[in-house]
């Protein structure tokens, strides 16, 4: 009997994310010498129904320390998992879910559980001498995702007046992932010059995800800026736009309306605004266009914005129960997958499979609080997701994912870049 995959040691510690906030890092060792480690990300605009990120609420780090989550790994989870076969991912995840005993992972913390879940998968892959994408996806993992690069930041990710959170470029006309990265990087530098010319050199400061955060006041102004950057780079035919409205962040529950540019706007009016934008600019995808609880509104938006990818992030929070409801209603047509929203690798894969089985596209995503950890790059390829959203081609915690994908494409030799087939990449 091969015991080389047996978990030999699990250890967690508190480290920092890209915003200087504490997060959980976990390391897993197997008896066969396999090693895996993961640093858990953290979001700024979070869905109400996300799994619980356990914070200490003490004076340290302004209440954001995660020492309790770290202790939960070292003192509780580790004791239960030592000796388990690291290849039994679903069993290991279920053991942790049983230990926690809550629907939202509020006892042990999703940050504790996820750190171990991903580190176990990495340790198993290392023991098997396989790259993570191949360990999870097998020989069928061959699709390189089209990157959605967030080059203009607003909302919770920046300090400007923009209501929408992310203005992204997606190089669907590239022939490979490496070429896609080049196109985006060149456009990013082109946009930097446009921003400097229009707003001054002091305006080329960047937001949490590496995109520029100039003093833009309107959504139309931001889109026009983006278009000029793409034109100057020479990629009008290759690059399209995607948006993350993060509409829950500017929704006023008391009045049931959205505050856009300082004015109250109804759901119908906001959908009309999206229609106007889609008609004027090369927008192919809109994430969280409406309030996270408005399944009916999402259904209408999906019907009205024909041909546009409507992505559910805060709407679904990578949760199969919420995704099932959306599928049954026809709310949205795409799932944004964030592993820390749900808290285990198994549940993340379940959500991806449910999306694909029901004709929903898939976007694997980072969080605004990231690290040098590049796990989601491997996951995007393992799932043949077709799309990945992990920030601008700037800041080390963002480029770490892009660089890993460049390596994976090189290693695969025969792969398919999703490109224009980003919705149905296989």
UniProtKB/Swiss-Prot annotation:
One of its GO terms (biological process) is glycolytic process. The keyword Metal-binding applies. It comes from the Archaea. Gene3D superfamilies: Enolase-like C-terminal domain (3.20.20.120), Enolase-like, N-terminal domain (3.30.390.10). InterPro entries: Enolase, Enolase-like_C_sf, Enolase-like_N, Enolase_C, Enolase_CS, Enolase_N. GO terms for cellular component: cell surface; extracellular region; phosphopyruvate hydratase complex. Binds a second Mg(2+) ion via substrate during catalysis. Keywords: Cytoplasm, Glycolysis, Lyase, Magnesium, Metal-binding, Secreted. The active site is at 209 (proton donor), 338 (proton acceptor). Mg(2+) binds at residues 244, 287, 313. GO terms for molecular function: magnesium ion binding; phosphopyruvate hydratase activity. SUPFAM superfamilies: Enolase C-terminal domain-like, Enolase N-terminal domain-like. It holds the Pfam family Enolase_C. It is found in: Cytoplasm; Secreted; Cell surface. Pathway: Carbohydrate degradation; glycolysis; pyruvate from D-glyceraldehyde 3-phosphate: step 4/5. It is an enzyme of class 4 (lyase). (2R)-2-phosphoglycerate binds at residues 165, 338, 367-368, 389. Its EC number is 4.2.1.11. Catalyzes the reversible conversion of 2-phosphoglycerate (2-PG) into phosphoenolpyruvate (PEP). It is essential for the degradation of carbohydrates via glycolysis. NCBIfam families: eno (TIGR01060). This is Enolase. It comes from Methanococcus maripaludis (strain C7 / ATCC BAA-1331).
